Design a protein with these regions (language model features):
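N-terminal signal peptide c-region/cleavage motif recognized by signal peptidases
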Residues: 15-17
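Positively charged n-region of N-terminal signal peptides that target proteins for export
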Residues: 1-4
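Cationic-aromatic interfacial patches
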Residues: 24-99
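Acidic/His-rich structured neighborhood in mature extracellular/periplasmic domains
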Residues: 68-173
């Protein structure tokens, strides 16, 4: 009986490993980046790792975001629409206000290029699926869709707030 359980566990572990590897390969195939992008991310991650575990999360955010000072602004850097397949773009050499936040948050949770890419998917897309309709197009999406990357503190700031649910510019296929 123990031998059967061990074989079953071994099989399940192998299956999980193969599935995870296939998902990682599919993810990396769908990444739109450049050697310059990888170099910049690795440079920032290296600078942050220099401090080891001494930095709080807020200090990590401050350290990473300071590395973007002087980075040129560029709108419409992401690839994907209702007519074009979504690609995971990572180009920290030019940012808009949203990609800046995506990159900083993702780097704050990463220790390598691979973990950065995984974190970017979790940050930018609902349920980690690279898809235009699942992209978090609005900052409020960070507080209400999984995984949650932000917390709505509006009611903590003022007792006079009201909640109004509206469907604004919902992206469709």
């Amino acid at each position: 009986m123990k031998k059967r359980i061990a074989c079953l566990l071994s099989f399940l572990l192998s299956l999980y490993t193969c599935t995870a590897l296939a998902r990682h390969q599919q993810l990396m195939h769908n990444v739109y980046d450049t050697q310059e992008s990888q170099s910049k991310v690795n440079e920032i991650l290296s600078a942050v790792s220099f401090h080891g575990n001494e930095l709080s999360y807020g200090e990590r955010i401050a350290e990473i975001s300071s590395r973007f000072l002087g980075t040129p602004y560029q709108a419409h850097t992401l690839i994907g629409s209702s007519l074009m397949q979504e690609r995971l773009v990572t180009n920290p050499s030019t940012v808009d206000c949203f990609t800046f936040i995506d990159y900083v948050r993702s780097m704050a949770h990463a220790s390598s290029w691979q973990t950065y890419v995984s974190e970017l998917v979790k940050t930018r897309y609902t349920n980690g699926m690279i898809d235009f309709t699942g992209r978090k197009h609005f900052f409020t999406d960070w507080a209400v869709t999984s995984p949650r990357n932000a917390q709505d503190v509006t009611q903590d700031i003022s007792p006079y707030t009201i909640t109004v649910n509206k469907r604004l510019n919902q992206k469709n296929k």
